[in-house]
């Protein structure tokens, strides 16, 4: 973490620029393996399943069998394990910034858009996997 660029978590601070959450030094990714559903809101395609390989406040790395277009907007729904069951979180919107093929699958880097709320499950996933 840089000394001259401290973490700014709240948008009501004077130094908040809008992209602070997405800067890699402010939002390190945490390795995880979490099931998700992905909806690209295409009328021809149903939502599909994937896995998140790492996550941070700024975005995540998504592993899926479906090809996603770069710059596409996705609605990602995380599933948190509670005992034996999985709990569905509120979907969050993200923009695909990079896609590459890995065998017959695809790995996409996604930047989250908008405010992150507790209902999205992101903070809980970070807390569970950073121990």
How would you describe each model-predicted region?
Residues 30, 44, 70-72, 88, ...:
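Residue-level preference for beta-strand/loop junctions
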Residues 117-126:
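A short macromolecule-binding patch
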Residues 1-55, 127-131:
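N-terminal helix initiation/capping motif
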Residues 81-91:
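Short, Lys/Arg- and Gly-enriched loop/turn segments at beta-strand edges
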Residues 41-43, 57-58, 99-104:
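Short, conserved beta-turn/loop elements at beta-strand boundaries and strand-helix junctions
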Residues 61-64, 102-113:
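Short, solvent-exposed secondary-structure boundary/capping segments
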Residues 48-52, 90-99:
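Short beta-strand-centered aromatic/proline hotspots
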Residues 30-36, 68-81:
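Short coil-to-beta transition motif at edge beta-strands of beta-rich domains
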